[in-house]
Amino acid sequence: MNTFEINRVLERFDVDPDRGFLPPEDPLERMPARWSAWDQLGSDLSALIAIGTARRAIRELPDVDTDDLRNPAELRRAMLLLSVFGNAHVFCEPDPGLRLPAGLCRAWNAVANRLERPMIIAHASIVLHNWRRLDPSGPIVAENLRALQCFRGGPDEEWFYLLTAEIEATGARALPALVGLRLAIDRNRHDGVAEHLDHVSETILEMTRVLERMEERCRHAVFYRRIRPFLSGWPEPGVVYEGIDSEPVTLHGGSAAQSSLLNAFDAALSVPHEHPGTRPFLQAMRRYMPPRHRRFIEWLEEGDSLRTVVEDDGRLAARYDECIDGLVRFRRTHQQITMRYITGQAPDRDRAIGTGGTDYADFLRRTRIETSDRRLH
């Protein structure tokens, strides 16, 4: 399969050949003048949270029409800001603000509907669309990035988002290979499979090396007490979106499971998650992804099983197992780091819940085991 053909598939699903699920152009840093009040509140938000007036400021946001927001970059920036305001309103004070104001909700609902995503903070906004480069010609690595928007602010919160963005940028290098694998299997042409598998395993190793740096600049206690609460979801009894729906809504919070990247590796490498403790949550998380990205994962899943194709070829089976081993190492590393950030900080076991609302330790352990079980030899 030639590069042109692979890139055509990626383009169909809004996946950039170089940046993967990150936007093809650097995220918009400011809204057009008509929506400047959102930018101003975003700039002031950390200070307002610190002095206890953020909720009032969010409730006083002007009710601005969004019909003229059509540019994808503008919609993504709007979704980032409005999602941050929504989660900040709920969690910026000890008593949750469970009734979101109509002025915020009407704009948020219009933007979310166009993007086909729920009205809550998600990986797509806080990671994929939340960075700028210090050196515009430099690489997308954490040291060359600054977050466009934070809740409380500070280097720990920025590092958490930006290193995750670097993982996305690193993993992007394997996405053309995943497409190449699917096309090769579809056409029963296996001559390029070994090279694609090598590229995938090397990329997963690099992703793990980036992930291992999380604790360099994001302290456990700061994450648990200052960052994690704002990334939480709406558990029972739920949140009311005034002006949109009078009934409370429950939603999951931001979660690494909302990243299309690991889901794409699982789909291409024939790693199903069928356990009752993993499948329902992973399927639910797709709703929080950009719609074309989730369709890309579905397209990868629809192909014939890569595992079945390579299992009788010793050379390809060994390379396949290297990819599986790499995914297991990545998931083990993620599990270990998460344990230190959450379980190690939680005052009791009952509060050791991930931002997505799961018993994260059991979920991460099971996804790792399901991955390991796919080894051929």
Model segments located where?
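Surface-exposed peri-terminal alpha-helical interaction modules
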Residues: 1-377
